[in-house]
């Protein structure tokens, strides 16, 4: 179909703001759009008359505005076309974006002069009589003073950085000009909701992320920014920040100014909100107000990113429901958006940005968006995507990546020289810039550094010497994340990931679960009572990574409640809450929700790294009853369940409550089912340097069917502790100090399971000398009384016997 001569080609998006003269010499419309298949969607748009005489006007007599958003040679092109021709066209293709731009165009293009259609929000003026925090008075996330440039350490160019700066990024500062170069890139903002006239602005970066349940587009500039949030379960909403000198106008009705939420705000920019207005629910209105509040509270990066983590934590602690998910998703994404706006704004105001903030910003974007897509809006985590344009020029981003690569290569040669904090900096940088996914052996180097840190922290955890502080938790998260970030088809990547999962399960002991739940409760109180700055990784636990699914079983809750007296913050909170036990139950529920939501779904993790379990299992039984999965070797895994249904070597665990049965199945292709026998034995001592128990797992369970711990024996040092018995310095291996009676099994990598008799025969009770003396004295008194009593009985018997004899003689007479 040829393009009629009366059709006017309006302009390319990048040229629109430059006011170029339109031309009418165009090729065939179909060839221009690159359309070969007939689309299933036909535009049926009625005549739309306009009265504007200006040739550059958006509305002309008997013409229709058309924006091509699909992937084609005409992508990003605006057209004016005669309405009569538009009515006959079938070329319009649904865009790849999930933001429903095509539906918006078709459904709301011909709204005429009616302003109250469902994509325009006439919010009442929003005013608050509260004190707004100063832009430069951000919350400090630690006890250290904020580092500032000095005369001897001024802001510099990226090319002057050295690899050592990667492990100490807090005291290096980058010139703002490194973000944009000599000239700031000017582009046109084309509204994804097709409601606003394109706006020219100085562009810094674009971020697009989402899943099958939602999509978010963020566009960040110096004096302009926008976020568009679209969900499968809710209408889209858009927030725009613009400098006061710029007018935002609607496409329909023609060039009508769009009113900001509050013209009288004290901020240097105006706030615009587009979203459903008519018949909006209370949740919708509440989310709008919260989005606006997040803009007006502060322009400080530290404040906004702390609020982002706080809201993400609250989201994780909130019971799952469509209403809660929609509201919380909007709140968290808006806070993340505002942290990016604040970072750019502060950098251009001060003329510099810290190297640490550049890296933390990229890491936060990845971690927060991926975490959201793990549990929000019933999304499939496998559909998560992130398209993040750096706020650095490409060549400058390459400089940073080159520094990180050099640091990683050097660190992989001598990981012992790195402290926990330095491990955190290196692994966070690798995670933020996707170094694990690069070609060559960089992924292997990152995995090596990560695994060495995990092994070191595992050793401390088993020996009860680990300090679960902020640095350790954050570093451990990035260590696991960097390993799983590596493509699983790379050499040794899957084996390393399976081993990492074993270490995670080994650190996720019963005591650690209880301690973590109490830490989460304390954070919830800090956020809701004190509004303290937090980071979601402050409560990270290996249990989030481990393939252990019994976190929410009731016995963990009981143990946590009994330990509340050791946590004054929780105890004081409960004392001031009139609900009593209900308040304590609520805190426990929130703690369990946080751990459960932050975990990667079981089937996704198994599909990637333990596919033999998925192949040999009934998916419903696996998801419903699996307590633990241990990928103990490169080919086989142990699965602990409450029901039968997994194909492999099946072990029926004896000595547990019949109502809480345990089954252990060793799974390996080709999924042949046989019955296994758990053999009781005394572990023989290995000779010389042999390590027959390396790679085994010590699994301990109680008589009521609860799993206590699964300790991975990863080295000869741990093997020596295991066979030391009562002389072992590790309490998990020492039968004389093992808490709570139970049974210990040793799981071998080849599928063999034995019961360790040492934990059943050596139950020694430690008794104080005072108790022994008291018991001895008491026993002596009891024996004396018994002797006296027996003698009295004997004497009484003799007396009665003699009387009987006398009576007998008397009768004979």
UniProtKB/Swiss-Prot annotation:
A GO CC term assigned to this protein in UniProt: viral envelope
Protein name, entry field: Envelope glycoprotein H
Function statement: The heterodimer glycoprotein H-glycoprotein L is required for the fusion of viral and plasma membranes leading to virus entry into the host cell. Following initial binding to host receptor, membrane fusion is mediated by the fusion machinery composed of gB and the heterodimer gH/gL. May also be involved in the fusion between the virion envelope and the outer nuclear membrane during virion morphogenesis.
Xref: Pfam families: Herpes_glycoH_C (PF17488), Herpes_glycop_H (PF02489)
Membrane topology recorded in Swiss-Prot or TrEMBL: Single-pass type I membrane protein
Region called Disordered, residue ranges: 135-159
Leader sequence residues: 1-18
Keyword Membrane attributed: yes
Keywords: Fusion of virus membrane with host cell membrane, Fusion of virus membrane with host membrane, Glycoprotein, Host cell membrane, Host endosome, Host membrane, Membrane, Sialic acid, Signal, Transmembrane, Transmembrane helix, Viral envelope protein, Viral penetration into host cytoplasm, Virion, Virus entry into host cell
GO biological process: fusion of virus membrane with host plasma membrane; symbiont entry into host cell
Family: Belongs to the herpesviridae glycoprotein H family.
Chain ranges on the Intravirion side, renumbered to this chain: 791-813
Record: glycosylation sites: 62, 116, 247, 279, 410, 434, 469, 576, 727, 750
Gene from which this protein is expressed: gH
């Amino acid at each position: 179909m040829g393009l009629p001569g009366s059709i006017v080609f309006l302009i390319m998006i990048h040229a629109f703001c430059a006011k170029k003269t339109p031309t009418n010499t165009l090729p065939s419309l179909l060839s221009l759009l690159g359309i070969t298949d007939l689309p299933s969607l036909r535009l049926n748009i009625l005549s739309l008359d306009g009265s504007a005489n200006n040739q550059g006007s958006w509305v002309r007599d008997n013409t229709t505005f058309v924006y091509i958003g699909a992937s084609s040679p005409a992508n990003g092109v605006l057209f004016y076309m005669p309405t009569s021709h538009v009515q006959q066209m079938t070329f319009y293709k649904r865009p790849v974006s999930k933001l429903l731009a095509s539906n918006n165009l078709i459904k709301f293009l011909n709204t005429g002069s009616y302003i109250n259609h469902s994509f325009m929000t006439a919010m009442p003026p929003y005013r608050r009589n509260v004190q707004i925090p100063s832009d430069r008075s951000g919350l400090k996330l630690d006890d250290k003073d904020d580092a500032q440039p000095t005369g001897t350490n001024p802001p510099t160019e990226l090319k002057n950085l050295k690899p050592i700066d990667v492990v100490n990024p807090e005291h290096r500062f980058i010139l703002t000009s490194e973000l944009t170069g000599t000239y700031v890139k000017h582009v046109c903002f084309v509204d994804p909701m097709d409601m606003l006239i394109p706006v020219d602005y100085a562009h810094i970066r674009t971020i697009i992320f989402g899943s099958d349940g939602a999509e978010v587009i963020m566009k960040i500039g110096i004096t302009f920014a926008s976020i568009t949030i679209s969900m499968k379960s809710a209408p889209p909403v858009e927030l725009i920040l613009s400098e006061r000198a710029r007018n935002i106008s609607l496409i329909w009705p023609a060039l009508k100014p769009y009113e900001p939420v509050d013209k009288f705000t004290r901020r240097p920019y105006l706030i615009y909100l587009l979203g459903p207005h008519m018949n909006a629910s209370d949740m919708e209105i509440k989310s709008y107000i919260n989005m606006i509040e997040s803009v007006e509270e502060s322009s400080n990066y530290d404040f906004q990113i702390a609020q982002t983590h706080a809201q993400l934590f609250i989201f994780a602690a909130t019971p799952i429901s469509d209403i809660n998910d929609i509201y919380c998703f909007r709140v968290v994404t808006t806070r993340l958006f505002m942290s990016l706006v604040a970072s750019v704004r502060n950098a251009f105001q001060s003329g510099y940005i810290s190297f640490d903030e550049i890296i933390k910003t990229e890491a936060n974007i990845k971690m927060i968006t991926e975490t959201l897509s793990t549990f929000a809006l019933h999304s499939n985590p496998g559909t998560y995507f992130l398209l993040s344009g750096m706020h650095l020029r490409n060549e400058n981003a390459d400089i940073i990546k080159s520094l990180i690569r050099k640091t990683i290569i050097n660190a992989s040669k001598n990981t012992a020289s790195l402290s926990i904090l330095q491990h955190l900096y290196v692994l966070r940088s690798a995670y933020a810039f996707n170094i694990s996914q690069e070609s060559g052996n960089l992924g292997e180097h990152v995995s090596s550094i990560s695994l060495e840190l995990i092994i070191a922290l595992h050793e401390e955890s088993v020996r009860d010497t680990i300090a679960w502080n902020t640095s350790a938790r954050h570093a451990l998260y990035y260590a696991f994340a960097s390993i799983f970030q590596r493509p699983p088809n790379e050499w040794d990547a899957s084996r390393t990931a399976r081993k990492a999962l074993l270490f995670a399960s080994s650190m996720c002991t019963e005591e650690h679960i209880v301690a973590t739940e109490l830490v989460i409760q304390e954070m919830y109180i800090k956020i809701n009572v004190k509004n303290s700055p937090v980071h979601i990784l402050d409560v990270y636990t290996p249990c989030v990574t481990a393939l252990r699914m019994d976190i929410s079983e009731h016995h963990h809750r009981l143990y946590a409640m009994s330990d509340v007296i050791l946590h004054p913050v929780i105890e004081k909170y409960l004392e001031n809450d009139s609900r009593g036990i209900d308040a304590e139950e609520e805190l426990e529920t929130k703690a369990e929700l946080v751990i459960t939501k932050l975990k990667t779904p079981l089937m996704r993790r198994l599909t990637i790294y333990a596919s033999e379990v998925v192949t040999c299992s009934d998916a419903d039984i696996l998801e419903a009853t699996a307590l633990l999965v241990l990928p103990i070797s490169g080919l086989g895994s142990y699965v602990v369940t409450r029901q039968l249904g997994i194909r492999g070597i099946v072990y029926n665990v004896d000595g547990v409550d019949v109502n809480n049965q345990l089954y252990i199945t060793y799974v390996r292709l080709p999924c042949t089912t046989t019955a296994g026998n758990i053999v009781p034995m005394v572990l023989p001592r290995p000779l010389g340097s042999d390590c027959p128990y390396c790679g085994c797992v010590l699994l301990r369970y109680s008589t009521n069917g609860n799993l206590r711990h699964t300790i991975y024996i990863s080295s000869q040092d741990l093997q020596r502790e295991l066979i030391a018995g009562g002389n072992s310095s590790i309490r998990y291996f020492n039968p004389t100090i093992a808490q709570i009676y139970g049974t210990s099994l040793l799981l071998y990598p080849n599928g063999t399971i034995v019961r360790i008799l040492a934990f059943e025969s050596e139950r020694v009770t430690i008794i104080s000398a005072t108790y022994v003396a008291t018991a001895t004295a008491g026993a002596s008194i009891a024996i004396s009384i018994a002797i006296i009593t027996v003698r009295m009985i004997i004497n009484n018997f003799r007396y009665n016997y003699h009387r009987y004899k006398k009576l007998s003689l008397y009768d004979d007479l």
